[in-house]
Design a protein with these regions (language model features):
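Post-HEXXH active-site segment of zinc metalloproteases
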Residues: 109, 113, 124-143, 240-244
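Basic, low-complexity intrinsically disordered segments
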Residues: 104
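Histidine-centered, transition-metal-coordinating active-site segments
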Residues: 1-86, 92-100, 108, 144-150, ...
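Short active-site segment of divalent metal-dependent hydrolases/proteases
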Residues: 117-125, 229
Length: 304
């Protein structure tokens, strides 16, 4: 099926162009000067190095960032450089998120820092490795292992990079595996609340994680774009790995079947209902795509 790429309404596109040309930003954008760190005497915001730009650089120069390169996204044991690895996935999340964030007038550095760091604690062998480690940890300690929690542990405890609360929270709350009908930022987060959320993730596992909502709209955008980045690419990789013969079973009149169609059309659908809002509503079409089509069709074929 050949699907026409959706376009933004002309009035919406005109408004976005005007806002960008005039430098108009969203009133819901999280400002660099409001970043919170455990050590507020270090890593202060400046013109040369804005707060969240610092977070980006800290993550990029982290030794564990290099380990993205050969970590499994979905398919392990394939000697094929055309199959997506974790390193490409985080770049795709960053690119899609920043594109949406630019149209919304949000903080692109905060979006990028969350996106680049969101899987830095992910396991080898993808979610299969994550489940296995969690089983071992529960057997020995009664606690749960989850990659989002380990990602912030890497940044905040193992390497102690003084990453901002807003970046850490966005990473902790990023899990695209748990969809919500509404993404409304939980404003006013403190490190005390954040630390409590982390502990609940260890003790309650998925039950606690699925209740998490980012404290910034930037974090909400990244969380949704984590889904957008993999729902088409994972299927494309399944064809490359010859697990699927073609993508016809994913055909949809709403979003198409190919990765490029999905990213474009989901971005347009999302943008139509997101302009300068305090929340992101996942409308019935998005819910159908993510909660029904992807889960129902993909899970019998392979596990993420």
């Amino acid at each position: 099926m050949s699907l026409k790429y959706h376009q933004l309404d002309s009035s919406v596109e005109k408004q976005i162009k005007e806002n960008i040309s005039k430098g108009i930003l969203s009133s819901y954008r999280f400002m660099d000067e409001n970043a919170v760190r455990r050590n507020m005497e270090k890593d202060k915001n400046s013109v040369l190095r804005p707060s969240f730009g610092r977070d980006i650089e800290k993550i990029l120069h982290l030794p564990l960032y290099n380990r993205y390169n050969d970590k499994t996204q979905v398919f392990s044991f394939y000697n094929n450089d055309d199959i997506t690895r974790r390193g490409l996935h985080v770049q795709l999340v960053s690119r899609i998120s920043r594109n949406i964030g630019r149209m919304l007038g949000l903080n692109l550095d905060l979006i990028e820092s969350i996106a680049l760091g969101h899987d830095v604690g992910h396991t080898p062998f993808g979610h299969a490795g994550e489940r296995y480690l969690s089983e071992l940890l529960q057997k020995e300690t009664g606690r749960h292992f989850n990659h989002n929690v380990h990602s912030i542990r890497v940044l905040d405890i193992l390497y102690r990079r003084n990453i901002s609360l807003q970046t850490l929270d966005g990473i902790l709350c990023h899990n695209g595996e748990f969809e919500l009908n509404e993404y409304r930022p939980q404003k006013g987060l403190t490190f005390e609340q954040y630390d409590n959320n982390v502990e609940l993730c260890y003790t309650e596992g998925g039950e606690a994680i699925k209740k998490l909502v980012p404290s910034t709209l930037e974090g909400c955008v990244v969380r949704i774009c984590d889904i957008l980045a993999y729902i088409g690419k994972d299927r494309q990789d399944a064809i490359t790995a010859k697990i699927l013969s073609d993508d016809s079973i994913f055909s949809s009149e709403f979003i198409g079947s190919k990765n490029a169609e999905m990213i474009n059309n989901l971005t347009v659908i999302l943008k139509r209902g997101m302009m300068f809002e305090t929340k992101i509503l996942k409308n019935s079409i998005i819910y159908f795509i993510v909660a029904t089509q992807v889960r129902k069709l993909a899970n019998p074929l392979f596990m993420r």
